Amino acid sequence: MAGSLAARGITVEHISRDELRFSMISDESEYFSKEKEVFSKFVEKMNNSLNKNDCTIIDATHISKASRAKILRRVENPDNVRLLVLYLTTPLDVCMRQNDLRTGRERVPHEVIEKMAKQFEDPTEKEFTGFGFDSVEVWEKPWKEGEI
């Protein structure tokens, strides 16, 4: 997504919570050991990007309303910025196949993905009310047939 926007001349910053985390740890066993620092850096990068780029993509799996509310309370929304939530409804089997294509630290154990899928709470427009979001869009099929 970031690549296709950039190809159209739109300045894009893609902020991945996992990439930030992996830059701060040396071993997978430390995955959540620096969560406070990861979250702080994630919020800092998000707000800096909202102020300087045409498009900021916040890449993180916020599976619960509570985890989404935690980040929403920290969004510093400049007046001229349109905030949009993209909810990508990727089926579990597609997530598993995509994950199987990953290597090293990026690959997530299947049991973790299955646990997250069971705990997932669908986002609603109501939960974003009051945070300055313009809309919540649901993308039913955010991948191309035969791609995965």
Set out the residue ranges of the language-model regions.
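Short hydrophobic/aromatic-enriched beta-strand-loop microsegments
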Residues: H14-I15, R82, R107
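Acidic side chains
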Residues: D18, I58-D59, N99-D100
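Glycine-rich phosphate-binding loop used to anchor ATP phosphates in small-molecule kinases
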Residues: S33-L88
